[in-house]
Structures are given as structure tokens and as C-alpha cells.
Amino acid sequence: MHVKAETVLALLTPAPPSVVGQHVVDLSGDGWTLSSTALNRTVPGHLPSQVHLDLFEAGVIDIMASMILTFVGLRMPIGRIPATRLKAYFESTWLVFDGLDTFATITFCDQHVGSTDNQFRQHHFDVSQILKECKQDPVLRINFGSAPNIANTIAKSPDAEEWPPGVQITNEYPNRWYIRKEQSDFGWDWGPAFAPVGPWKPSYIVQNSHAELYVLNTDIDIYRQGQINYLPPDQSQPWIVNASIDFLGPVPCKPSMSIEIKDAATGSVLSSGLLQNVTVSGKSITGTTTIDGDAPKLWWPSGMGKQNLYNVTITVQNDMKKSLAKVTKRTGFRTIFLNQRNITDDQLAQGIAPGANWHFEINGYEFYAKGSNIIPPDAFWPRVTQARMARLFDAVTAGNQNMLRVWASGAYLHDFIYDLADEKGILLWSEFQFSDALYPVNDAFLENVAAEVVYNVRRVNHHPSLALWAGGNEIESLMLPMARRADPTGYSKYIGEYEKLYISLILPLVYENTRSITYSPSSTTEGYLYVNLSAPVPMAERYSNTTPGSYYGDTDYYNYDTSVSFDYNHYPVGRFANEFGFHSMPSLQTWQQAVDPEDLQFNSSVVVLRNHHYTAGGLFTDNFKNSSKGMGEMTMGVEAYYPIPSKSDSVANFSAWCHATQLFQADLYKSQIQFYRRGSGMPERQLGSLYWQLEDIWQAPTWAGIEYDGRWKVLHYVARDIYQPIIVSPFWNYTTGRLEVYVTSDLWEPAQGTVNLTWVDLSGKSIANNAGTPETVSFTVGALNTTNIYTTNISELSLPDLKDSILILSLSGEGRLPNASSKKAFVHQNHFTPVFPKDLSLKDPKLEVSYSPESRKFTVQATGGVSLYTWLDYPAGAVGYFEANAFVLLPGVPKEVSFVAQEGNVTDDWLQRVTVQSLWDQKVRD
């Protein structure tokens, strides 16, 4: 079952032989056709695109009907071609494909050109001779095969590798691990299984004269002299700029390379001249230069300084000084290092527990990584635009995040996404596309992976936002233990295969193409014992070779037992938290984008089936059993801690339940983030919190903090608040009654200030004698540290009614942001209640909201009582965020809040439809 498309490429009249140069035809745009023998349909096509998108635009399928889309992914390959013009007088003609998803067969002038089997590689084919022999107007055809069908065929082959039953994780389509395609296309617990195919990235026809070079890829590596990937760089050393280009065309005779480095903001020249040590290896030309260590302005992550960027132009010349190729890339000067070295004696003397470090250092400075995990922002990458990603990354920096982990088994991010991260100061922990499976290690598979690794490492290496390369997701922490339990006697085999792929193959390829980036074989590890680059397995992982009382590596934590959600004794103690979370429902407005009105019920079949936690484990369209488990977990979380919605209007009740699941999710993440950040001053010296997950791929219950269209859930607001540089946090052991209050800072210098501790009842009246609690406590908190400012036991406080009490914690301090010239004021507010929200004697806060055109701000005030989880909500028609939300509001203390519009039309009518509610409204019947 194939789809064919074709368009004529008309040849021009040949030009004189003296014509030289280069002709590049961008095949992007309309003019393609998509045809299917399976559906007996031919429709207009586009490039870049994928089959589902063109069929949807032609009205053949409903893109919201996930079961139909799954069928399309299984049954429909695709072919395309745009109309354009070629020139007959060039000596060489190449087809260049930046991304074909995944199994494609290419023909040109009815001649077979080649085939592809890797979504993540760039492919190029020489069609010079085919074009010269073409007797008619040339036609380009690309036929795509069904990835699930081909994966199944590979799995059935006699020489296919096999693993113990129950080890490989199938979400919907099976056998994803046999092929090099986006693994989440086969289904995941936060997204659909559409398995799209098509030319998902741009494609070109390149025609060269006898001398010209076409640049396929560019690797610019900037590092300190003597820097080695797994060791801390010496910040006193000069900078080395290593420039390497991969090209099409004849190998030039005695080539030279020149460089010009300009400040991207001012245009001033930092350095120019010839590169040294120019070498040619295969189809790559490489040269280096040295820059004085203090000459460039450094690039810093968000919150730590400016994002200084430079444009680097590389020119290749032949021995006659004729320019053969020129390429410009924007980059920055910084060092980023993942420190996994053993704890030193000096660190032990500071009170840091023994073991090994696991934290990042930027330009020689330890910092606290605050952020989340980013998944594919759409099931179809051609729909992911620069404007859309700019809005998402604006939300990241507005949320006080400085790092995103680019989760493995989506896709390697486009260059424009790294460009945005460079501009906004967002570090991108990047991973190779392997996740939650064991993978083959046969020669053909490894050869395919090697090309994928080299291409992508070189492609993105110039971006200062690139923070790390990790081998894959949860391979060492989840998959190897699963294999050990399933087949204890064969465990050494699986360890050997893991090391063959992620250490013996990928690690040297990374190190050969960059000296500026650290590599970790897996997202979650205990770190390494030693590195010996001359050994067959160059990195010896620690695995379970740990010592009690010592800490190693990063942590990955999910616990769906809601009875212990807020018991921080259950949270993992480690050096870095790279995954943790709990799912919640999206808002009513988001559900309305994808679900018919009659299905807007918490347990409607449509809503339940869009919940893929837990996944079907196969191609089952009625996964009620597993989906209901995930729905039940959200329900139990709400019922255990929050007022249970019971509204007479079914849609209002559905909306209230959606909001309640978000409250639980946000409070759980807040509890964990506070705990992990406090660890910066504890023996574990914990220096990172990346929660799961940043954003949604569609409208469904997931772990996301930002919904599919960009609307913030409660989580993103709460994370924004608790990711501020200096915070005050309560820690309550509800079993013993012990209450501790900590101030935590991620500044690089000590900070000072005061915390006001104020007990009031839920009508807003002060509790007598402040319940025996000091009203003000002064603090000094060290750099990247935490300090306990108050400890008590609830039983020792003079609280007339625990259910009618709330402690307001208000911090006011002063400190200096990293690389800032002067100190600034910091404020933070938190709260604590000695019972869970469902047990509080809530009062109607009688909330009011108004908008002032003059100040362009909303004013929210409570006149009847304390408003908990004060929630401003906006109608459809625009996307943006409030500068504060989900806050505590005391009666008589109005709060002004701005709205930042990111997309859409904010009209007067729209402004008047902004609403406000609180926890009180969750329990009130309308």
C-alpha cells in the first residue's frame, strides 16, 4: 500500500561550459501531491510535512480522531514532489534530505536513487549521471513505508535480537526498539501513537560546478585550552575555536580556512584571520584558532548573566585563494561541565557527604539547575514553528527556569529551537534517542546509530545552550534492573550490550566531535568509577557499587501512592533530581478544543481514553482498564487532600474536578522542589530539580505544567514561585507534628533579610500572641545554601482551632544575582496550614476582580476571608499568563496582577470575562 506523488522538473537550456557556481533548489512548499493505493486517493501535499497533515488538510481524516490517525500511520506510506526548474549545465547534482521519516525509497527520472531507514540522519544522493541520462523532464518520487509494519517485519526475522518477556516496554505499537524513529510515535503515557511518515525536514536539490563545495553540516567547538570532556576546564586558559565543515563536492587541493568572529549585538570584530592546522579527512575540513581567555564576553544561563552571542563566519579557499564555501553560525563562549568526580577532602570538611558529585558548572561556577523536562511539543514536527517555540521558551524563563532536559525518544531538536535557547539563556540537556527499552547491537544497527550520533553532535555543537549529551532515558536505572529481574543468569549479557552501544560506540563518537560537552551514558545513573579512553569500554559505570551513607548520581522518582504524597521522608535523597511528577487534567478551555460538549465529564469514555497513564500495552482502542487506573490516582489525590467538587452543572463540575487535580499536582511538585532545593545545604549537596514535564503534546491528562495551546496549569505558576532565587519554605512532619522553616538561596553570594511569621484565622484575624511564634526572624543564608530559621511542634503552639489557622511566611531580603554589579531586593511569600486543605474551615473570601485600563492591571481583593489558591482564569481567544496566580490573599490587602498576552486578541470584552476563584469555590454548589 503506497502513496505516490510526482511533479515535473523542467530542464533549462544548457549554458556555456564556462559557467561556474552553485544552484540550490529548496523543495519546501506546495506543488507536491500525495497519493494512496490503499485509500485510492490523491491529494495536494507539502514539504516539509507528514502524511496525516496533508490528509487532514484535504479533508480525508479528522486529526482529532486518534484511532483513525493510528490506522493511517499503520497503513499509509507517502510520496511527494514539488515543481521547480533544474539547470543542465552543472557537473554534479545531489538530492539532500535533512530528514525523512523514516523508511523511504527515492527514485529520480524513474531510476532508483537510494533508501533511508533513520529519521534522525541527513541523507544525500548523487544523481548527476541519472540527470544526464534522463530523456524526459525529470520526476522525483519518494515512497514511504509504514514504520510499525517494518518494525514488526524486522522483529520476525530469524536473526532479530530478543530479550526476556516483560522487559521491553510496549505502549501501543510494538517493536519500536528495532528502528531509528521517534520512539514516542509508537505511543507513550502522555501522548498518542500516530506513527507519522513523511519528509519532516527541508529537502534540497544541489547543483555544483567543478570547484564549488556545498556545506552539509558545521561543527564549531569552543573550549578552554587543554579541556577534556569529563574533567573541569581550567578557566585561566585561552579559548580554542575548532571549526569543521562537512561538504559535498571534490576535495580541494591544499585548502585554507579563514575565520571572522563578530559580536552579534554590536558587529564589532573579536577575531579574524586564517585558521591553523587545517586538515582534510574524508569529506570534512577542519581548522583551529586561539582566542585570548578574557577577550570574549561570556554566555550565561538565564538568571546568571547576559546571553552574549557571536557570529562566526568560516570561509574555505583552495590553493588559488578562491572561495569554495562560506558558512556563518551564531555561537557563544562558555564552558559547561557535568561534575561526576568523587567528593574531595575539602568538600567533606564542609559537611558534604562522601560519594561523588553530580551537578553542573557554568564557566567554572556551581549553580542550581532549575527547570523541567521537555517532550515533543506536537505529534507532528512540521507544525512546530519558531513563533510557537518562542512563546514556550518565554514561559520557561518567566517560570524562573534555567535548564530543560530534552527527553530521549522524541527527536533531536531543530536548530531554530537551540537558537531560541541561546537567546533566552535556557540550557538544554540533550539526549540520544533511546528510551525505556533494550536495543540491538548488531553491526548494521550500530553503523546506523553511529552516523546519527556524529551528524547530530556536529550539527548542534556550536550552541552555547547545549549542556550535556546523555545516552538515553532510564536505560541504566530502569531497563537494566528489569532485565536482571527477568533473566538473572543473562544479566552480564545485557550489561555488555548496554556498554557496547552507549559507552564503547557513542562515547568515543561524542568525544571525537566535541571537547566542550560532557557525556553520560544514561539519563539517571550512579555516575562512573573511572574513565580510560584507551580501554575497550572507556567509562566504567558505578552501577550498584555504592557505599551506605554515600551519595551518587541523580534521581528519578514517581510515586502514585497518594497517601504519602506530602511525606518528604519518601522523597529520594541524591545529588540531582532529573525526573519526578504526577499527572493532572488540563483545563476546561483546553478540553473544549478537542472534545464534544456531551463528553465533558470526568469519567466519559472520550476523556478516559485520552488518558494514556497507564498505557494499553498494545493496539487496544478500549483501554479503559489501564486508563481508569490513572484517572483513579488523580481522584484519590484530590479526595485525600482537597474539597471534593460537587456542582449541579455538569460542565462546571467537570471544570472544578480538572482544577482540583491541578491543585494536587502543583502542591506535590512544590513540596518536592522545596525539598530538593533545601538539599543544596544538606549533606547530599543537591544541585538540581528538573520536574516532569514542561508541556503537552496534545489535549489530555498528563504531567505537563503548560497545556497544548500554551495555557499555564497551576503547576507552572507554582513552580515559577518556588523557583525564585530566595525562598522561604515550611517542612511539616504531619506524623510527629514537627514544623521547620527554611530559607534557601541559589545566589552565589550570601544573602540577608528577615522572615515575618504571621498566624491568622481563615477570616483573616490575627491569632492571639501569634500562637507563640516569633513574629520576625532574621536570617543569613550562604551561597547556594539553605538555613533553618525556625523549628517548633504544632502541639506546642497556641492555636485555638487547627482547622481555622494559617501561617503566612513573608520573606524580605537582599542579595546579588550572579554577575550583577549591585545587590537587589528579594521577596517571597509562602504559607502553611496545620491540616490539609480539605479539612480547613473555609470562609467565603468574597473575591472581586476588576481591570484598570490605565494601569493595565487586574486588582483582586478579598472582603470576606482568607482566599487560598486564588485563581485568575482567562477565557478562550488569547494565550498568555498572569504575573501571579494560585496565591494566598488576605482580606483587606488587594493585589494587582498583570496579564502577559503571548498570542491572540485581548479585547475589552475579553478582559471583562476574566474570572477569579479560590479553594472555597471548589466546594460550593452553584
Swiss-Prot record:
Location(s) in or outside the cell: Secreted
- Going by the record, the broad EC class of this enzyme is hydrolase
Active-site residues annotated for this sequence: 474
Q: What is its EC number?
A: 3.2.1.25
The positions making up the signal sequence are 1-21
Q: Which Pfam families match?
A: Glyco_hydro_2, Glyco_hydro_2_N2, Ig_mannosidase, Mannosidase_ig
Annotated keywords? Carbohydrate metabolism, Glycoprotein, Glycosidase, Hydrolase, Polysaccharide degradation, Secreted, Signal
Cellular component GO terms, alphabetically?
A: extracellular region
Which reaction is the catalytic activity of this chain? Answer: Hydrolysis of terminal, non-reducing beta-D-mannose residues in beta-D-mannosides
Q: What is this protein called?
A: Beta-mannosidase A
